[in-house]
Amino acid sequence: MEKYEKLEKVGEGTYGKVYKAKEISTGQIVALKKTRLEMDEEGVPPTALREISLLQMLSQSLYIVRLLNVEHVDKPPKNATHTPPKPLIYLVFEYLDTDLKKFIDTFRKGVNPRPLPNSLVQSFLFQLCKGVAHCHSHGVLHRDLKPQNLLLDQQKGILKIADLGLGRAFTVPLKSYTHEIVTLWYRAPEVLLGSTTYSTGVDIWSVGCIFGECNRV
C-alpha cells in the first residue's frame, strides 16, 4: 500500500479494521477498510464483494458513503521466509470524521447530559430516510442500520449510510434471507422471531429505533 500512509485506526468490526489514511500523491484524507483473504478461500470474501457491488450501484446518492477505490495487496509475512504472502483487500472510502453513536455520546455523557437538539434530529432523520429510500429504490436492503454505521461530516452537517457488508438485493416475490442479522437493539420483530422472509420494513424499523436513540438522554 505504497499509495497511502496510515494515520490511525478508527474502527474494527466483524469484517475488518478501518484506518484513517492519507493518499500520498494528493494529500487527500481517506478511510481504508482492510479485509483479510483467508488462504482456504477462493477469491474475495462474499461480504466484501457484496459491499463493493452495492456501493458502486448506490454511489450517486449524497447520503451513501462513497467508495473511491479497491486495492488488492499481498502482505509479506513477518519473520517467515517460506510462508506465502497474506492477500488483503483494502476498500478506499471518503473520510468522515465521526459516526452518529459517537456524536450522540458527546451530548449524553457531558457535564449536562441531554438529547440532541430537535433541529439536528430532524436533519439527520431526513438524510437517513433519503439514504434508505435510495437503497430501497435500487432494490437493496441494508439490514444493519445503527448509529455506528451512520457517518457524519460535522462541518457540513451531512449524514451518510455506511457498511453495506450485510446488505442484500431484494426481489419481488420475496425470497428467503438469514435472520441472523443486525445489532439486537435495532432488529425488527419479524427478524427477532426468526422469519426468513422479510422486506424493506426491517430497515424502516431500524430507522425508528435510531430516531428514539437520538432523543434519549
Summary of predicted features, one role per range:
Residues 17:
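Conserved N-lobe ATP-binding subsite of Hanks-type protein kinase domains
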Residues 22-30:
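Conserved N-lobe loop of protein kinases adjacent to the ATP-binding glycine-rich P-loop
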Residues 29, 34-60, 75-77:
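Conserved N-lobe beta3->alphaC-helix segment of eukaryotic protein kinase catalytic domains
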Residues 49-50, 86-90, 94-156, 205:
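Conserved alphaE helix
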Residues 60-71:
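Conserved HxN/HPN-centered segment at the entrance to the catalytic loop
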Residues 166-168:
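Activation segment
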Residues 177-191:
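Conserved activation segment of eukaryotic-like protein kinases, specifically the C-terminal portion
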Residues 191-202, 216:
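Conserved end of the kinase activation segment
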